[in-house]
Amino acid sequence: MKKNYYALAYYYLTRVDNPQQEIALHKELFKDLDVSCRIYISEQGINGQFSGYQPDAEYYMNWLRQRPGFSNVKFKIHHIEENIFPRVTVKYRKELVALGCDVDLSNQGKHISPQEWHEKLEENRCLVLDVRNNYEWKIGHFENAVLPDIRTFREFPDYAEQLSKEHDPATTPVMMYCTGGIRCELYSSLLLEKGFKEVYQLDGGVIAYGQAVGTGKWRGKLFVFDDRLAVPIDEADTDVPPIASCSHCETPCDTYYNCANTDCNNLFICCKECIHSTKGCCSQECSQAPRIRSFAPCRGNKPFRRMHLCEVTKEKEEAASSCCLH
């Protein structure tokens, strides 16, 4: 099938005097375009994940670069076959990355290109730090990277404190990376505040590395926050051996699902055989739960939508009404 949609990942830190106006302009523009997205705008700038029919995506990129303050936005593009978000979401978020503390964005690590990053990996001189959540690096990461056991962005400040106690900040050079680069903009500042003298950040994140270098020193797949959930970092190299395993049978696997049990919704890795036997659930206990969303093999591992929650509620109400009649 011809891939005629684009997936765009981008962010830009810049002063935005009227975020609500930018949000309104985005929403108005998208009314007539075949797109879906999750875009956050604040006084700090913009953080966007977007998908759209190729001509509409190109129109949006040109439009945004013509907006005051956004002329230098860099878009990372993947070719896809359909929209990958459930709806158009453009909203205000005070923190573009939900860190929970203030950081000095004027004091950041040194941005290095994917090529420079690869060369430094070859040197094996620095501590390579994955600053993503644990469920992200579980299915893919750089060779020999330090993998913090954190599940939310807000846990990183405490981890930065821990890191400064485990390694001498004055003599430990750090190379940090994330999916697209925006988390490193904040996290590098935190490490500098903790006394680390030499902090590098991968410009454009893992996405840019995959596009510029290829698989290189990367192992596994890249977790993404959209319907795909996991992708190879090199579009030309899709035969990627899994580095994770099924949570039920430990078969090598890197496919994520969210639990069909409405009251769980846990994100878990599962093979094709086990996902069927457990009715799309993360455990046998969840497979016996009263509010299970219907799982069909044809839907693949696409995350459940809110409408499934509505369907479960409706079925429960209808069942209750039926009981009352007898």
Swiss-Prot record:
Please name the GO terms of the biological process aspect recorded for this protein, alphabetically. Answer: tRNA modification
- Which GO molecular function terms does the record list? oxidoreductase activity, acting on paired donors, with incorporation or reduction of molecular oxygen
Q: Which residues form the active site?
A: C178
Name the species this protein comes from: Chlamydia abortus (strain DSM 27085 / S26/3) (Chlamydophila abortus)
Tell me the first and last residues of the signal peptide: none
Q: What is the lineage of its organism?
A: Bacteria, Pseudomonadati, Chlamydiota, Chlamydiia, Chlamydiales
Pfam families from the xrefs? Rhodanese, Rhodanese_C, UPF0176_N
Residues forming the Rhodanese domain are 122-218
Which InterPro entries would you find in this protein's record?
Rhodanese-like_dom (IPR001763), Rhodanese-like_dom_sf (IPR036873), Rhodanese_C (IPR022111), TrhO (IPR020936), TRHO_N (IPR040503)
Q: What is this protein called?
A: tRNA uridine(34) hydroxylase
Functional description taken from the UniProt entry: Catalyzes oxygen-dependent 5-hydroxyuridine (ho5U) modification at position 34 in tRNAs.
Q: Kindly state which keywords UniProt assigns to this record, in alphabetical order.
A: Oxidoreductase, tRNA processing
Family annotation (HAMAP family)? TrhO
Record flagged with keyword tRNA processing: yes
Similarity comment: Belongs to the TrhO family.
TM region positions: none
What the entry lists under SUPFAM superfamilies is as follows: Rhodanese/Cell cycle control phosphatase (SSF52821)
Task: Write the Enzyme Commission number(s) for this entry.
Answer: 1.14.-.-
According to UniProt, the reaction catalysed is: uridine(34) in tRNA + AH2 + O2 = 5-hydroxyuridine(34) in tRNA + A + H2O
